[in-house]
Amino acid sequence: MRILLTGGSGFIGSHAAEAMLGRGWEVWCAVRRTSSRRFLGDSRLHLLETDFEDEAAMEAALQSLRFDAVVHAAGATKCVRKSDFHRHNTLLTARLVSVLQRLALRDGASECESRLPRFVFLSSLSAINSIEGEALGKPTAYGASKREAEKIVEACRLPWVILRPTGVYGPRERDYLMMVQTLCRHIDFAAGFSPQHITFVYVTDVVQAIMRAVEGKAEDVTGHIFTLSDGETYTSRDFSRLIAGELSALKGSRHRVLRVTAPLFVLRAVCRCGDIFMRVTGKAVTLNNDKYNILSQRDWRCDISASRRLLGFRPEVKLAEGVRRTVRWYRQNGWI
C-alpha cells in the first residue's frame, strides 16, 4: 500500500510513519523545507519536500505519484496570531484536498470512484463546541480552524474519514511535557476550583485508529467522524498523581510535590502574558489566550462507542501505563 503522510515530522505523524513502515507500507512523507527530520531517519521513508502554502508547488510534487490513501496529520496547535490557525489548519487542508481531487480526476478517477485515494484527516475534539448537546464553553481559534477543515473534507469527492482525538500524550509530545517539568520542580499546579473531567488517548492508540481508518471496509468507515479516547474519564489530579508516582519510581524514593490550586483568573493572567510575549517575540508559546479556553473548560468527556463499533477501535493503553512510558521516555531522552 502506498501512503501519502503529511505532518510526519510532528508528534503523532512520526509515530504513524513508524507504524506504517512496520506494516510494510510504502510511505511518502510530505514535509516543508524547514521541517525537522529528527524522527524521520528511517531509510525506507520517502521524503517529499514541498511548499504547503503554494498549491501549484504541491501539485507539481505529487503529480507523478498515485496513492492508495492520504493521511493528513499536518497542522498547528499553537500560533502567534489566531488567524494563523486558519492558514495552517484550514487553508492547508483546502489546498491538499483540491490538489488530490484534481490529480485523481486527471487520471480518470471520476469514471472509477474506487481509484480515488482514501483521505484520513486528523482533527481534534476541540473542533466541536458541544458534547451530547452540552455546551463546552467558549470556542477556540484552533478548534474553529479544525472544524472548518472538517467541513472542507466532508464536502470533497474523496472517500474520507475524520478522526477526533481528545488530549493525545506520549513520547515526543511537548505540551504535556510542561506539566511533567513543573512536577519535576515539585509543584502540582491546577487552575479552577470546580471539578474538571478530562480524557486522554495515548499516541499509539491514535496511530491504531489511523491504520484502521486506512484499512477498514469503505462501508464501515468512510463518511464517518470518529472520536478517540482511552474510554475513561479522569481529573487533572489523576494525571499529575500518576506523573508524580512515576517520578518517584525513577528516583527510588517518594517525589514530594506541593499542590497549588489557583483561581481561573490567575491562569487567564498567565495566558495573557503569553499572548504579549508572542506579539513581542514572534514566537508561539503553549500558554496563550486561545489555550486558556481549552484549559478552563471543565468537561471533556466523550463517547467512543461508534469508534469501537464501526472502526474497530480498541484503545490498549490506559493512563497509568501511558504515563509510565511517557515519563521514562522523557528521562531517557534528556527532556526532563
Language model: regions and residue ranges:
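Amphipathic terminal alpha-helices
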Residues: C302-L310, R314-I336
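Conserved beta-loop-beta element that borders a ligand/cofactor-binding pocket
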Residues: E150-P171
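Conserved C-terminal active-site "lid" loop/helix of NAD(P)H-dependent oxidoreductases
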Residues: V203, I225, V270-R314
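Mid/C-terminal beta-alpha module of Rossmann-like enzyme folds, strongest
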Residues: G216-T286, A320, R324-R325
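Conserved Rossmann-fold NAD(P)-dependent oxidoreductase catalytic core, especially the SDR/UDP-sugar
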Residues: A94-A141, V161
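Substrate-positioning beta->alpha
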Residues: R174-M178, G192-E215, G223-T227, S236-R241
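N-terminal Rossmann NAD(P)H-binding glycine-rich loop of SDR-like oxidoreductase domains
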Residues: I3-R23
